[in-house]
Design a protein with these regions (language model features):
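Serine-hydrolase catalytic core recognition
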Residues: 260-261, 317-318, 325, 461-772
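N-terminal secretory signal peptides that target proteins for export/translocation
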Residues: 1-5
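Beta-propeller folds
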Residues: 8-12, 16-459, 468-471, 481, ...
Length: 772
């Protein structure tokens, strides 16, 4: 498509920004490109040439005595007897569940694939997930799963009784395929509860008697699961919890009748178009009403929690049992999401007692379950009340709060609680926000922030810890180093067994022309420090001028400047450096970098405004410091929130950015969902100007450079509707652009044969065509 180059340029006052010294995480290539086979899109995305080693699903046993993994069975079956080449091929009958002793790494097959073959079949069940009963006498297998929005949360469940070796399917003799959700054992292992048709059922395993616990689903009522927006923005899918004594189940009920439906059209799968309709509350629209019920398993009677002032203007993002079977802890949040009240709820009558209130001037940006200590007198809680995200121990009545971590840094995750030895383990990085390390503090508050990860593991470290905190699967990677995994004894970080080295991938990477990279910092116009990374070609020559491509996200759901392996995303960037580009990324304010409350919440009421200014400031600082960056050839791209940022950079700073590729953007913030957008942008009635100015569509008339706009028509998250409205606005002002729609693809634009290869080829060609 021929695109008209516009001659009207907006003036911009140049603001002085400075580039700070490079951090110690800088890494320079040790060799230049010599006879290396160049990377191609096909090598990365079609041939799987650089696929990472896969360790498989690992799960620690509840007592910490070892872990289980799913591995291909050595048992085979004969196939293809009638094939044209007269050969017989052997293939595995399925997968085994094996046990590993962490001390010796001795391997034992606990469940063989043969045990998972249903009567009359010759192939074992495919294991999508599994759960042990507490006494490990029964295994719950999840299989034949189907995608519901983001995850495969609907499927078939089977029980394997290890005492009788009997395999049976749950849901009754007339159960429909892939119709059960979130099945889990009662604490004593005698029953399994699950959701089907938006109601909760419990099945007794001894006789497979099924009892319906809720019966009011339908006409917008859903029990034990969530509507689209709760699932997406509160990251919750499983909507019910067994009591510790197994006599009750606490559950969410959502009444979505007040929420308007969004409708998507599918033009490709049938002869005539089909429609998908689901409740989706947009900004300012009516939400679902959330309630918490506690149902008695024996008589199916529900007691409702008496939450004060509960309405469609309130949220219930978290709920769980409170260390006993008599009370449930409920978190109750107002629509503005600046106040979270924690209530202890009596299951006998639904009465509630307020024990803790978290309140912010602007918004609460995370929700976490309270983690109860074994005695039930205290729970572990994360809070930003000090200005930094830290861990606290809170007494049952909320009267005593002890800070277990301290300092001018954020913890990112609680990893494990070792009550026996008095430790809590967590992830943090006080000295470098691009990295992650394991720390621990004493549960009594006497010692905090003891680093466990050794210094040689500079980069990003993750830990899958046993429940007692004694053992862990340690995963380590850095910017240009693929993930490796080892089994460690946590005390002293003692490496016991190497589980994954990625040796093959490392050899393949060594054969490539390795680009230079470094992490750096710039100071924005108001003195705030911004972090980023930059990649330069292996044959880099500082006396030359290079076009630069920025990868951007820039919203509260993602940090891009991280010292970790990014897989194919890194390889695509490396390919771009081989083709003569410099690649960079900057984290602006509002991203979830562990830099404190003020950093993350400075964007309130102005999403897209301050963040785009930060990006522009960073670009100007970089071009002032590094003369090899060609300021006339600046490109940018991003997906989702990054797609929105790409549009804002092209529209708000057209004199700086010449080429942009925007994937699945939120073109108008008023079209996005209520929970996310109102959390960060405020209520529309209070911040109408912020919504207006922060939305790219408002500034579409300023487009001067090259824009490639991409969206999937089946996007249930960021609706295609917004892109169509943006297209109308660009047409209105005769702004020429390129556009690609992917029929019926969802937000990730991954479904369908050849989609990723096609997408990445198009993006690569676009930058080469317009930025060189």
């Amino acid at each position: 498509m021929l695109i008209t180059k516009l001659s009207r340029w907006c003036a911009l006052t140049v603001i002085s920004v400075s580039l700070m010294a490079c951090q110690s995480t800088s890494e320079q290539a040790t060799t230049k490109s010599v006879n290396h086979v160049p990377l191609t899109v096909e090598r990365i995305y079609k041939d799987d040439e650089f696929s990472s080693q896969w360790l498989g699903q690992i799960r620690w046993l509840a007592d910490g005595s070892g872990y289980t993994a799913i591995e291909k069975s050595e048992k085979t079956k004969e196939t293809d007897k009638d094939s044209n080449d007269d050969t017989e091929k052997a293939e595995s009958i399925g997968k085994d569940i094996v046990f590993y002793d962490p001390t010796t790494l001795a391997r034992q097959v606990l469940i063989s694939a043969e045990q998972l073959i249903p009567a009359g079949k010759d192939q074992a069940l495919s294991i999508d997930n599994y759960l042990w009963s507490d006494d490990r006498s029964q295994l719950l297998i999840y299989t034949n799963s189907k995608k519901v929005w983001r995850s495969n949360s609907r499927g078939d469940y089977w029980i394997l009784n290890l005492k009788t070796n009997q395999l049976s399917q749950l849901g009754g003799k007339d159960v429909q395929d892939s119709s059960l959700m979130f099945a889990k054992f009662s604490p004593d292992g005698s029953k399994v509860a699950y959701v089907t048709d938006n109601n909760i059922y419990v099945e007794t395993l001894a006789n497979h008697h099924i009892k319906q616990l809720t019966s009011d689903a339908g006409n917008g009522i859903i029990n034990g699961l969530f509507d689209w927006v709760y699932e997406e923005e509160f990251s919750i899918r499983d909507g019910f919890r067994w009591s510790p004594n197994g006599k009750s189940i606490a559950y969410w009920q959502l009444d979505t009748r007040g929420s308007k439906d969004f409708i998507m059209i599918n033009n490709t799968d049938e002869l005539y178009p089909t429609l998908t309709k689901f409740p989706y509350p947009k900004v300012g629209e009516e939400n679902a009403l959330a309630k918490i019920g506690i149902v008695n398993v024996s008589n199916a009677k529900t007691t409702w929690a008496k939450l004060p002032n509960n309405s469609r203007e309130m949220y219930v993002p978290r709920m769980n049992w409170s260390g006993n079977s008599e009370q449930v802890l409920i978190q109750h949040v107002n629509r503005k999401q600046d106040t979270n009240k924690l209530y202890l709820t009596e299951i006998k009558n639904g009465d509630v007692e307020l024990i803790l209130t978290e309140q912010e001037e602007n918004f609460l940006d995370f929700y976490d379950d309270a983690k109860w200590l074994e005695n039930g007198t205290d729970f572990i809680w994360k809070s930003e009340r000090s200005g930094w995200r830290h861990i606290y121990k809170v007494s049952r009545d909320g009267s005593n709060i002890v800070n277990l971590t301290d300092g001018a840094f954020d913890i990112t995750d609680v990893q494990a609680i070792d009550e026996k030895n008095g430790w809590i383990y967590f992830i943090a990085s006080p000295d470098n926000v691009a990295q992650r390390y394991l720390y621990r503090s004493k549960l009594d508050g006497t010692l905090s922030n003891q680093r466990i990860t050794p210094k040689e593991y500079t980069g990003s470290n993750r830990y899958q810890m046993s429940s007692d905190g004694q053992w862990a699967i340690h995963s380590f990677s850095s910017f240009a180093q693929p993930t490796q995994k080892q089994l460690i004894k946590v005390d002293g970080h003692q490496a016991k067994h190497q589980l994954m080295t990625n040796e093959k991938l490392n050899k393949q990477l060594a054969a490539l022309a390795k680009p230079e990279h470094e992490f750096f910092q710039v100071t924005a116009q108001d003195g705030v420090v911004l972090d980023g990374y930059i990649m330069r070609p292996a044959d880099f020559d500082a006396s030359k001028k290079y076009p630069i491509i920025f990868y951007v996200y820039g919203e509260p759901a993602g940090q891009t400047a991280q010292d970790k392996w990014r897989g194919n995303a890194y390889l695509w960037d490396q390919m771009l450096t081989e083709q003569g580009f410099i690649v960079a990324s900057i984290d602006n304010r509002g991203t979830p970098a562990p830099k404190g409350r003020a950093w993350r919440k400075s964007i309130y009421g102005a999403v897209g405004i301050l963040s785009s200014r930060d990006q522009a400031d960073a670009l100007k600082a970089m071009t002032e410091r590094w003369s090899y960056i060609d300021s006339d050839r600046v490109g940018i791209w991003g997906h989702s929130g990054g797609g929105s940022m790409t549009l804002n950079m092209l529209f708000r700073y057209p004199e700086l950015y010449k080429v942009g590729i925007s994937l699945a953007p939120v073109a108008d913030q008023r079209l996005y969902d209520s929970i996310y957008q109102e959390r960060y942008s405020g209520l529309l009635s209070d911040y109408a100007e912020g919504y207006e100015q922060g939305s790219p569509i408002t500034h579409a008339k300023n487009l001067q450079g090259k824009l490639l706009l991409i969206h999937g028509t089946g996007d249930d998250n960021v609706h295609y509707q917004g892109t169509e409205r943006l297209i109308n606005e660009l047409i209105k002002y005769n702004r020429q652009f390129d556009f690609m729609s992917y029929p019926n693809r969802s937000h990730g634009i991954r479904e369908g044969e050849g989609t990723t290869l096609h997408l990445k080829t198009m993006m690569t060609n676009y930058f080469n065509q317009h930025l060189k």
